[in-house]
């Protein structure tokens, strides 16, 4: 019932998206679920994924309090807050962010982020300091009760775990004028079944290589494809490395020369371009107001949505 209410709330936001798009709102970075999706449920059937001897049912892979771990050798032992969580509200962190910390298109990759940064972001979500430009967007709204339910010890154990992980390159970036035609999925898009193509326009098209393995089976080895417009990578590099008039841009000064973070400043290299654009837009629109977001405001206020797209396209090509 709660999920259906959230989906209805998201549907109502479609009008907001249509209006906001007129003022350069990057709607492609904020996929909405217009109605509760019909998940492909195969009750009792043992599922398999490539490279794993583990067998799980769909019901097991979708259990928020017992994370599907197809590849235990890919990561160290998980603390309980990551692998199991605590009922009723503190979901297992790895349910959404995966045992390897790779996350998905709808949320953040946590692998290798500073532990103190992770802790602060969860606390900012709990207090409302970190919000989103679409405050009823389900991936964000579902995190609020989780962030409020988790204890300090649980949070710090999870943050230490994810911080210890080495981030993996999960993106396959393709630059061009055309991209797959899309269909709405749960929280993100995927290519239509007929393989049709359409002009990419001023968008980044990002989706999991294998929707079923990613969303239903929760296989953390599934990579993501990001189609970016022709010329966007070079334009993004120019903005990030040689601002060319936008003197407020000084990414390396805070995020490090290789953009993989510096101290408690997070890495921005090799991250989901959709995620990067959402964060830039959220900060610019005043939805994110944590201490680090405030430091970013002079930077993002110098950007338009095309700048954000180009920067995100370039960052996606970098090793994490």
Question: What are these model-predicted stretches?
Answer:
Residues 95-102, 126-127, 163-166, 254-260, ...:
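Detector for the c-type heme attachment site
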Residues 266, 274, 305-306:
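Copper-binding active sites and cupredoxin-like electron-transfer domains
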Residues 71-83, 95, 100, 107, ...:
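Post-signal peptide N-terminal segment of secreted/secretory-pathway proteins
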Residues 1-10:
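Bacterial N-terminal signal peptides that target proteins for export
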Residues 22-91, 133-250, 286-320:
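Flexible coil segments in periplasmic/lumen-exposed cytochrome c-class electron-transfer proteins
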């Amino acid at each position: 019932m709660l999920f259906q209410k959230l989906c209805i709330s998201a549907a109502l936001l479609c009008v907001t998206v249509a209006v906001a798009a007129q003022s350069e709102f990057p709607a492609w970075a904020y996929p909405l679920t217009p109605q509760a999706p019909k998940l492909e449920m195969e009750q009792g059937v043992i599922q398999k994924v490539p490279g794993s001897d583990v067998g799980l049912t769909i019901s097991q892979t979708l259990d928020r309090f017992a994370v599907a771990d197809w590849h235990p050798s890919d990561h160290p032992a998980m603390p309980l807050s990551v692998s199991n969580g605590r009922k009723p509200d503190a979901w297992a962190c790895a349910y959404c962010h995966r045992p390897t910390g790779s996350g998905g298109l709808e949320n953040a990759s946590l692998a290798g982020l500073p532990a103190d940064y992770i802790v602060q972001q969860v606390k900012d979500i709990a207090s409302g300091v970190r919000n989103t430009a679409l405050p009823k967007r389900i991936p964000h709204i579902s995190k609020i009760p989780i962030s409020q339910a988790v204890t300090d010890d649980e949070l710090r154990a999870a943050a230490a775990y994810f911080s210890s992980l080495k981030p993996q390159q999960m993106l396959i970036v393709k630059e061009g004028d055309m991209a797959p035609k899309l269909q709405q999925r749960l929280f993100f898009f995927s290519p239509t079944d007929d393989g049709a193509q359409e002009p990419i326009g001023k968008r980044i098209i990002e989706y999991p290589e294998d929707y079923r393995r990613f969303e239903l089976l929760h296989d953390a080895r599934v990579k993501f494809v990001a189609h970016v417009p022709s010329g966007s990578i070079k334009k993004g590099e120019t903005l990030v490395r040689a601002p060319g008039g936008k003197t407020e841009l000084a990414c390396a000064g805070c995020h490090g020369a290789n953009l993989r973070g510096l101290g408690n400043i997070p890495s921005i290299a090799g991250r989901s371009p959709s995620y990067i654009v959402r964060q830039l837009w959220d900060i610019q629109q005043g939805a994110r107001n944590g201490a680090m977001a405030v430091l970013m405001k002079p930077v993002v206020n110098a950007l338009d949505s095309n700048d954000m797209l180009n920067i995100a396209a370039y960052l996606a090509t970098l090793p994490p």
